[in-house]
């Protein structure tokens, strides 16, 4: 345990930082719009640039991780996000903002392939479920801190200061990781060293494709809840924004608790495919109840909290399922490819959900979430059911 804890803590800190830096920019949009005289659409395009580069380059980062190991790639990713955030903080116009966002997006692309290569390579099998659980929770913590941090400093000292302060946080984390880099060094697998070029054949196996589809469908459902849940609840039930927002917050809190509990559950079961199947099925049933309108308004926070808890349970097991589908020497590229599915699901569905709301079918948002969740259950049941044997990256 002593050798595992520093690795899990360091990688979790890096993951929290990546999520923190992803979300420091949007709360500053009103201040940036006023000072720079640009539209929200323009600022939205800058944010889109970040996520597109992150999604497209994530599989490529996985290939690099497999070839040289995760340590150098992770440190490089943190460095790029630091530089990108600092450049945005110093920028005086849209083009420098876009360049900073691009650098940050490139840096963000490395975290999932590098993190999971390191965790799989350094953490003992018995503690992997807990390691994946903490990894997921750390990302949520980064998301939770970012809006408070950037909005608070932005209101006090301006958006430039907020971004420069965020870059300083990244600098402190980079220093922490660099001075402890020996703790998470992982040698590239011999199979990856022997492979020439960028062999994508491993990504075309049905198991890996099923993992990608599972992540994409899960993200599609999550987008409906987090991005359109408040609007859908208001339109469908005519409730106040505060109650609708409280319900979504309850979902996130329940999800975080579920992630921690999921680590213990996954560590104690051999049929790891049943955990995400059961969790998503339970969440889907709650979404169906919401769509049909049988849940009273005052019970919405409790219903969303239960749904979030059920989904949170699935996070550690889904990462172990990806591990089970990964051949030796391909950890980086498989995790990079599969996690790109989250970005695809997030990009592909907002217009659809918006169309449902525009056409007066607010409950259709929850019917759609229900459908995406059931499709995700189908894909996860196609994956290896047993815990993977120990393999090194």
Feature locations, PLM:
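Extracytoplasmic gate region of multi-pass secondary transporters
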Residues: 26, 207-252
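Residue-level signature of mid-helix packing/kink "hotspots" within the transmembrane helices
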Residues: 23, 51-59, 143-144, 252-256, ...
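Helix-loop-helix hairpin linking two adjacent transmembrane segments in secondary transporters
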Residues: 135-182
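Juxtamembrane intracellular "pre-TM" segments in multi-pass secondary transporters
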Residues: 184-211
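C-terminal transmembrane helical hairpin of 12-TM major facilitator-type secondary transporters
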Residues: 273-318
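Conserved MFS/SLC helix-loop-helix module at the cytosolic interface between two early adjacent transmembrane helices
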Residues: 56-92
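Cytoplasmic helix-loop-helix junction between adjacent transmembrane helices
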Residues: 100-138
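Helix-to-loop junctions at the C-terminal end of transmembrane segments
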Residues: 57-69, 259-271, 357
């Amino acid at each position: 345990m002593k050798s595992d804890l520093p690795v899990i803590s360091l990688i979790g800190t890096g993951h929290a930082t990546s999520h923190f830096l992803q979300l420091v920019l949007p709360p500053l949009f009103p201040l940036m719009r006023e000072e720079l005289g640009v539209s929200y659409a323009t600022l939205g395009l800058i944010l889109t640039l970040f996520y597109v580069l992150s999604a497209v380059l994530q599989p490529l980062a996985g290939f690099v991780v497999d070839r040289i190991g995760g340590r150098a790639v992770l440190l490089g990713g943190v460095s790029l996000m630091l530089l990108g955030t600092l450049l945005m903080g110093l920028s005086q116009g849209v083009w420098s903002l876009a360049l900073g966002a691009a650098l940050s997006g490139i840096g963000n692309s490395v975290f999932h392939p590098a993190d999971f290569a390191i965790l799989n390579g350094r953490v003992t099998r018995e503690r992997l479920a807990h390691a994946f659980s903490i990894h997921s929770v750390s990302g949520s913590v980064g998301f939770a801190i970012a809006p408070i941090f950037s909005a608070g400093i932005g209101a006090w000292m301006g958006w430039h200061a907020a971004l420069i302060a965020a870059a300083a946080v990244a600098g402190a984390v980079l220093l922490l990781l660099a001075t402890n880099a020996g703790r998470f060094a992982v040698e590239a697998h011999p199979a990856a060293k022997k492979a020439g070029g960028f062999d994508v054949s491993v990504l075309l196996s049905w198991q890996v494709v099923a993992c990608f589809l599972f992540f994409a469908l899960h993200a599609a459902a999550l987008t409906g809840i987090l991005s359109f849940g408040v609007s859908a609840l208001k339109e469908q039930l005519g409730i106040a924004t505060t109650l609708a927002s409280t319900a979504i917050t309850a979902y996130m809190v329940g999800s975080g608790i579920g992630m921690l509990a999921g680590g213990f559950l996954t560590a104690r079961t051999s049929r790891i495919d049943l955990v995400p199947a059961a969790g998503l099925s339970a969440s889907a049933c709650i979404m169906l109840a919401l769509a049909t309108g049988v849940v009273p308004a005052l019970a919405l926070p409790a219903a969303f909290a239960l749904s979030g808890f059920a989904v949170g349970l699935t996070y550690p097991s889904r990462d172990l399922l990806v591990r089970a589908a990964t051949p030796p020497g391909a950890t980086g590229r498989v995790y990079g490819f599969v996690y790109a599915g989250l970005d695809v699901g997030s990009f592909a569905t907002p217009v659809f959900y918006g169309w449902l709301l525009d056409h007066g079918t607010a409950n259709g948002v929850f019917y759609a979430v229900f459908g995406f969740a059931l499709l995700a259950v189908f894909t996860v049941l196609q994956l290896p059911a047993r815990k993977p044997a120990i393999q090194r990256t």
